[in-house]
Design a protein with these regions (language model features):
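The feature captures the beta-strand-to-loop junction immediately N-terminal to the Walker
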Residues: 38-40
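A short, flexible loop at the N-terminus of ABC-type nucleotide-binding domains that lies
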Residues: 1, 10-24, 74
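ABC ATPase NBD coupling module
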Residues: 69-83, 113-116, 120, 236-242
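Walker B catalytic motif
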Residues: 174-175
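Helix-to-loop junction immediately C-terminal to a conserved catalytic motif
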Residues: 53
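Conserved beta-strand-loop-alpha-helix hinge in the C-terminal portion
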Residues: 226-250
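Conserved ABC transporter NBD signature motif
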Residues: 61-69, 231
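H-loop/switch region of ABC-family ATPase nucleotide-binding domains
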Residues: 206-207
Length: 257
């Protein structure tokens, strides 16, 4: 289980631009749950992910992974148990290295191993079999530089790499936002399959309300550091895009927009 307990986060403390984003914010995510997170810009979505991954530190509260407080763990240490796929397809992979080299690095993440271990014939065959179900032809492009791939191919590779080693949590940070609609649908189908087959606990931040409704078994809507909507199970399955738009409009009116 992942628990964010009584978190407080202040940006630009002691300045005229000081902003308290989270004040006593708590969230518990059981093992195996796939959570979709929506909300307007500045609502706290990405900050929540950054707090979990260790990119930023809280000013109070706890972040517990399987009951252990991980606040003192570096971002690098947390990455052993947390896979993250970013909005930018260029992140999460190395453009100047080949697909094979990227897969090798991901395969031995956290282990004292060099690239030569990834060139073993059995590993190469295994990589091809991992890539084949993607349906993007990557299994025949192992020697190609990642920088030559399309955005969709690169994002699919990043998703695969982030889940190659045993992880506890998968963080999806608007990972389809930079893709065209058709490619985004392909990546979302792949995402759903990977989460389901590997039985991962996943948190997906998205601006695509259709994806938020169609994927996952829990939905959160964030606003100014608070969860203004939290539905799981059958209640989540009953949520429609129109329901989300209604809440967005109500919030907009309250804020004077």
């Amino acid at each position: 289980m992942l628990e964010v307990k009584n978190i407080r986060k202040i940006y630009n403390p002691g300045t005229v631009q000081e902003k308290c984003l989270f004040d006593d914010f708590s969230l518990s995510i059981p093992d195996g749950q796939f959570v979709s997170v929506v909300g307007s810009n500045g609502s706290g979505k990405t900050s929540l992910l950054n707090l979990i991954c260790g990119s930023i530190q809280p000013d109070g509260g706890q972040i517990l992974m399987q009951g252990r407080d991980i606040r003192k763990d570096s971002e690098h240490v947390r990455a052993r148990k947390i896979g993250r796929v970013y909005q930018n397809p260029a992140m999460g992979t190395c453009a100047q290295m080949t697909i094979l080299e990227n897969l090798s690095l991901a395969d031995f993440k956290g282990k004292p191993a060099g690239l030569h271990r990834g060139t073993d014939r059995r590993r190469i065959d295994a990589y091809r079999e991992m890539l084949r179900p993607l349906g993007l032809g990557l299994e025949d492009m192992l020697s190609s530089k990642v920088g030559t791939l399309s955005g969709g191919q690169r994002q699919a590779l990043a998703l695969l790499m982030s889940t190659m080693t045993p992880i506890s949590f998968l963080i999806l940070d608007e990972h389809t936002a930079a893709l065209d609609p058709i490619t985004a649908d392909i990546i979302m189908e792949l995402t759903g399959r990977v989460v389901r087959e590997k039985q991962l606990t996943a948190i997906m931040v998205t601006h695509n309300l259709r994806y938020a409704v169609e994927y996952g078994d829990r939905i959160l809507m964030m606003h100014q550091g608070h969860a203004v909507l939290d539905k799981a199970g059958e209640e989540k399955q009953a949520v429609r895009i129109e329901d989300l738009l209604t809440i967005f409009n109500e919030i907009s009116i309250e804020c004077g927009n």
